[in-house]
């Protein structure tokens, strides 16, 4: 990270984070990281950015719609890093393949509705409850955090039609 900020002259780094690792630790980089070690790693990255007057995006690096573990992680991150001007929140990395329950071939409008409001979706053949982006944002704000939040469009973030169709005009 030092090289990226100091040698390359970067002003911003996107740090992929995983809610399962945040909650339980992980086997990562051939090391068995505990929850505490994983969270310290993220904290060290945030401190490095802040010490240099740079920025870091904490990027929830999953493609499937947010679920309860994502929401829980964002609540904790909002408390820990809320109003830290070095930290931006990437709510969900490149969402795609949003399949509402009971819909064979979902339209873009149906996918955007789930993106915004959440709902029951199929993931890997199983029904799960998706948390909408508005709920994520609401929970972050309830914790008192005013950090910039980044919300990508559908289909690996290429489809931003929902923003053009009014999702950006809803209260947040």
Regions found by a protein language model. Give the residues of each.
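Aromatic-lined substrate-binding rim segments of carbohydrate-active enzymes
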Residues: 2-76, 80, 129-143
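Extracellular glycoside hydrolase catalytic/binding regions
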Residues: 1, 55, 67, 71-81, ...
């Amino acid at each position: 990270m030092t090289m990226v900020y100091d040698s390359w002259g970067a002003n911003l780094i996107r740090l992929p984070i995983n809610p399962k690792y945040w909650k339980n630790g992980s086997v990562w980089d051939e090391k068995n990281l505990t929850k505490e070690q994983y969270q310290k790693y993220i904290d060290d990255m945030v401190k490095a950015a802040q010490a240099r007057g740079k920025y870091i995006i904490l990027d929830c690096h999953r493609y499937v719609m947010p679920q309860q573990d994502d929401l829980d992680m964002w609540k904790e991150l909002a408390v820990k890093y809320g109003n830290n001007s070095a930290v931006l929140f990437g709510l969900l990395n490149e969402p795609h393949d949003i399949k509402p329950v009971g819909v064979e071939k979902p339209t873009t409008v149906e996918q955007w509705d789930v993106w915004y409001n959440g709902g029951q979706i199929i993931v890997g053949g199983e029904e799960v409850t998706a948390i909408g982006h508005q709920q994520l944002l609401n929970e972050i704000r309830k914790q008192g955090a005013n950090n910039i939040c980044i919300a990508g469009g559908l289909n690996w973030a290429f489809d931003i039609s929902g923003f053009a169709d009014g999702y950006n005009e809803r209260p947040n």
